């Protein structure tokens, strides 16, 4: 991502990527949003006052705890409504969390609300695609750029990649090893690089990072749609 371009485009009220307008379209479930729209939406969030990646998200913790009580094979209407409310609260602080969007897609689908199911499925896939478009994750210089630590883990979970403990390779990049190497078109991959520079900016010297959980609980996987 070119930071100067992102700042210029998202702060200019005459730009098609003016941030308040992009966020309104995203929140309304606009299905006409393009890859470019999502690029400026996701990375432009780093320059919004609401972006506070180091703040604790107690609503996220609450949503995960509630999700762990849901019987995903035979959920009740009450448990799904409770889950949706909790996830929406958590999205206020982390509006692009793939795991939260995945939970919403599941919950709405289980309730028979196909419209909101598809909206959140599209949001999740678009966010994941935006991150993957920022690099290939195979080298420090082509690391995937993310806004929250959890987004990195969710991306790996979405591809069913089981990972080990991350290690720092530079001031802004970490390497996440895979427990089992995978073979792809790029060859044999042992792990991926993630750029956390947006998170590290203005980090207090005494701040201690806490790693988030990913969505791998109760065997809930990213849903697949035709």
Predicted regions and their residues:
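N-terminal alpha-helical interaction modules that lie
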Residues: 1-80, 142-226
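TPR repeat positional signature
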Residues: 59, 87, 101-104
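Canonical positions in the second alpha-helix
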Residues: 89-90, 124
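Boundary/linker segments of alpha-helical solenoid repeat arrays
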Residues: 98-99, 126-140
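TPR/TPR-like (Sel1-like) alpha-helical repeat modules
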Residues: 109-132
């Amino acid at each position: 991502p070119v930071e100067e371009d992102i700042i210029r485009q998202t702060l200019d009220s005459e730009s098609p990527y003016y941030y308040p307008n992009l966020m309104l379209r995203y929140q309304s479930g606009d299905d006409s949003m393009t890859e470019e729209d999502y690029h400026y939406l996701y990375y432009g969030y780093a320059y919004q006052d609401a972006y506070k990646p180091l703040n604790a998200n107690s609503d996220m913790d609450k949503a995960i705890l509630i999700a762990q009580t849901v019987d995903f094979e035979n959920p009740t209407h009450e448990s799904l409504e409770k889950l949706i409310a909790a996830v929406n609260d958590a999205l206020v602080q982390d509006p692009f969390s793939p795991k939260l969007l995945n939970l919403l897609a599941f919950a709405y689908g289980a309730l028979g609300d196909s419209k909101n199911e598809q909206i959140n499925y599209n949001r999740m896939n678009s966010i994941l695609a935006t991150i993957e478009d920022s690099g290939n994750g195979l080298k420090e210089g082509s690391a995937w750029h993310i806004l929250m630590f959890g987004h990195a883990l969710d991306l790996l979970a979405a591809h069913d990649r089981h990972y080990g403990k991350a290690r720092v390779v530079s001031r802004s990049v970490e390497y996440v090893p895979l427990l089992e190497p995978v073979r792809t078109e790029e060859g044999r991959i042992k792990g991926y690089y993630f750029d956390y520079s947006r998170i590290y900016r203005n980090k207090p010297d005494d701040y201690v990072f806490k790693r988030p959980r990913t969505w791998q609980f109760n065997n809930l996987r990213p849903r697949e749609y035709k």
